[in-house]
Amino acid sequence: MAEKKILKKKVVKKSIAKGIVYISATFNNTMVTVTDEMGNAIAWSSAGALNFKGSKKSTPYAAQQAVEDALNKAKEHGIKEVGIKVQGPGSGRETAVKSIGAIEGIKVTFFKDITPLAHNGCRPPKRRRV
């Protein structure tokens, strides 16, 4: 029997100059996604993906590492300007935003907080009793 040749598609890296960094900072983790202006994901990272486990995922240091990892992946696509959209009340929120400004070769164009606020919609979960 003849061997079958398996053809693989070549991954072509797009050259994208502008993008948007979405930072989702929850109480347990920090997720970072870099997209183009249309919203197509280019690179992503999170504290959990960088092998921070348990309570270490929610630290500001883990958030900083996640941002640096995602932006280094995005730099390979040619990102030079980014806008920042932050969501959530997590502890790594401010550190993540500051670390974007510290990365060389990346210019921040805008900053927006997109945390959803309820206008007396659904009833919140019951209070925790410890």
UniProtKB/Swiss-Prot annotation:
It comes from the Bacteria. GO terms for molecular function: rRNA binding; structural constituent of ribosome. One of its GO terms (cellular component) is ribosome. One of its GO terms (biological process) is translation. Keywords: Ribonucleoprotein, Ribosomal protein, RNA-binding, rRNA-binding. InterPro entries: Ribosomal_uS11 (IPR001971), Ribosomal_uS11_bac-type (IPR019981), Ribosomal_uS11_sf (IPR036967). PANTHER family: 40S RIBOSOMAL PROTEIN S14/30S RIBOSOMAL PROTEIN S11. Located on the platform of the 30S subunit, it bridges several disparate RNA helices of the 16S rRNA. Forms part of the Shine-Dalgarno cleft in the 70S ribosome. Belongs to the universal ribosomal protein uS11 family. Part of the 30S ribosomal subunit. Interacts with proteins S7 and S18. Binds to IF-3. This is Small ribosomal subunit protein uS11.
